[in-house]
């Protein structure tokens, strides 16, 4: 893969750009496989530290910058400079999976918006897109292992692993992950982080 990337950098043309797209997909699948292999005890690799939602979102957007640009994506970031305590690597992976799905299941002129809400014990991150949405029949199963649903079968090759792994990681980090959707209108994924003070009070 490294050799192929060097070749692409040295000779950019429509063919090598298509190869670059496929290499990015391979990178994504490899990352999913590695997380899946460690999913039973992934918390051993956690490094819980102070960060901000803005840092996590920027890191995930950087990873998916090229496919976002190719999809005409326009990320909108609203009031994300909010401190949280979390494992940055795992949270960036989860946000990246959500961005990846927004790209896969987009309509023309992809829009993806990041917004927040805070209360006494929780900080919520909302990630909303204007894509094709998820059917009411599929929505309860989006976190099932291997579930691809109608969208996965019709529009895009899908492993059905990304959201499954994201849910497992979030549970281990005491983050509540949920999905709501209006078919044909878009999808909103919500990550609810416990505040640092709440974690201390709960002894977590």
Residue ranges and their predicted role:
Residues 41-46, 83-87:
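Conserved micro-motifs of the catalytic ATP-binding
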Residues 102-103:
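Short helix-loop "hinge" at the ATP-lid/N-box region of the Bergerat-fold HATPase_c
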Residues 134-147:
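Short conserved segment of the HATPase_c
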Residues 129:
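Acidic ATP/Mg2+-coordinating residue in the GHKL
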Residues 67-76:
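Short conserved segments within the C-terminal catalytic ATPase subdomain
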Residues 147-157:
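Glycine-rich ATP-lid/hinge loop adjacent to the conserved G-boxes
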């Amino acid at each position: 893969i490294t050799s192929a990337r060097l070749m692409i950098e040295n000779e950019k043309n429509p063919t090598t750009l298509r190869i670059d797209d496929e290499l990015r997909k391979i990178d994504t699948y490899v990352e999913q496989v590695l997380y899946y292999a460690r999913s039973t005890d992934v918390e051993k690799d956690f490094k819980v530290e102070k960060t901000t939602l803005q840092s996590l979102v920027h890191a995930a957007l950087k990873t998916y910058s090229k496919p976002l640009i190719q999809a005409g994506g326009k990320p909108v970031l609203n009031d994300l400079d909010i401190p949280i305590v979390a494992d940055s690597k795992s949270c960036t992976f989860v946000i990246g999976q959500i961005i990846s799905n927004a790209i896969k299941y987009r309509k023309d002129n992809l829009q993806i918006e990041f917004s927040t809400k805070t209360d006494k014990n929780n900080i919520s991150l909302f990630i909303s897109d204007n894509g094709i949405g998820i059917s009411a029949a599929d929505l309860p199963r989006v976190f099932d292992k291997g579930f691809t649903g109608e969208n996965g079968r019709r529009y895009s090759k899908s492993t059905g692993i990304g959201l499954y792994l994201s849910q497992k990681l979030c549970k281990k980090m005491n983050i509540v992950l949920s999905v709501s959707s209006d078919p044909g209108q878009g999808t909103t994924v919500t990550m609810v982080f416990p505040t640092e003070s709440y974690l201390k009070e709960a002894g977590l």
